[in-house]
């Protein structure tokens, strides 16, 4: 009689306890996605510069109105806690000291991708849609464009737009957010 192997997914609570217990190396860059732990790709200079630029611009635009979160965890559900490059969060005076933001707190997620474009587009962006995050951007460094995904329904984004160098990327859900694609790409 053959026996099927069964996967056992890790919950966010278990993952966080593992981190607190020192199971992971301090230099490990990890994400929990759908119950599985993934090693994050190294961050190159163009990627890092883009994240810094976005963070600075968004802080300038929304200072005191929204929280700009950079490479911090978001608890999507009991089995996923990604660390998007940038996220715009609803303002909270405690700055989420007692719990990570959840989808209801997130107005926009931005993933910056160089070597991870396909996996971010086909795996992480749909994960954000399934969680109900209203808008996600993929800054596609190789193709020099920003891909906007908005209005999640039935686990997928209904609106998809592409902004090229020379365009202004205009948020679909945040009225005051418009940013030069050329400036973002550097």
Question: Predicted regions span which residues?
Answer:
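Gly/Pro/Ser/Thr-rich low-complexity, intrinsically disordered segments predominantly at protein N-termini
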Residues: 1-186
